[in-house]
Design a protein with these regions (language model features):
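N-terminal secretory signal peptides and thylakoid transit peptides that target proteins
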Residues: 1-14
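Boundary at the C-terminal end of the N-terminal hydrophobic targeting segment
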Residues: 18-25
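A short, Trp-centered hydrophobic/proline-enriched beta-strand micro-motif
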Residues: 39-56
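Extracytoplasmic
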Residues: 44-46, 60-62, 68-70, 80, ...
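Short hydrophobic/aromatic-rich beta-strand segments that constitute the beta-sheet cores
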Residues: 51, 73-77, 92-95, 140, ...
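Surface-exposed, polar helix/loop patches in the mature regions of secreted/periplasmic/lumenal proteins
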Residues: 97-142
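Gly/Pro-enriched, hydrophobic low-complexity segments
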Residues: 123-209
Length: 209
């Protein structure tokens, strides 16, 4: 599968044209919120949840996701969606089971890579570009400081207690893919095999052309 096909299938994955940096001057309340979100995200080492995804074209799919920081994530889509997404070894891999085709890109070039860092920092290499406050909810918009062309990520939290509820990835064409977490469960242990993948061309490999 080539990059054009991957972009069409999952717009949240690929870098492209750069976003203009958004000016954001955090208030004292914003700084408290940013610190609380940092602490919360760094407190999550493992997370399992059902998910519901809405693509830019309105297509809805779901499945189960596992997050194991640092660096590991798996999205197993329910039928009829034939997709599998696995992050490990610094790579985000996408496999289309129906076509038996695989593509991968560096995790560091994806917005989701921010969540999988060994230590999540919402300053320095990552910048907060805005905070929205809604009844019972707070939304942080973030992007990589040095490579805004990777896209941006909006993290939505229930505010009391602070709980990650949803994220929205905006691609360089301003198209949004929204993922809502259902019944998330933090902690526990996962089988390491969840984050392994063997393509016909070799372990955790596949076409990247």
């Amino acid at each position: 599968m080539n990059r054009r096909s991957l972009l069409a299938a999952l717009p949240l994955l690929l870098p492209g044209r750069a976003f203009a940096a958004e000016a954001f001057a955090p208030t004292a309340q914003d700084r408290v919120t940013i610190a609380a979100v940092e602490a919360y995200l760094n407190g999550i080492k493992r997370l399992r949840a059902k998910f519901l995804q809405v693509a830019p074209n309105g297509a809805i799919s779901g499945g189960t996701m596992w997050l194991d920081r640092p660096g590991k994530m798996r999205f197993d889509y329910d039928p009829p969606a034939p997709f599998l997404l696995v992050a490990n070894y610094g790579i985000l891999l996408y496999h289309d089971k129906q076509l038996d085709q695989t593509s991968n890109i560096p995790l560091s070039q994806t917005p989701l890579g921010i969540l999988l860092s060994d230590r999540v920092r919402l300053s320095g290499d990552v910048q907060v570009t805005g905070i929205d406050r809604l009844p019972g909810e707070v939304v942080l918009r973030i992007q990589r400081t040095g490579s805004p062309g990777d896209g941006s990520l909006a993290l939505s939290f229930i505010d009391k207690p602070l709980t990650l509820r949803q994220w929205t990835v905006t691609d360089p064409q301003r198209q949004e893919t929204r993922v809502t977490l259902l019944n998330p469960e933090a902690g526990g242990s996962f089988d390491a095999k969840l984050f392994e993948f063997k393509a016909p061309s070799g372990p955790f490999g596949g076409s990247n052309g």
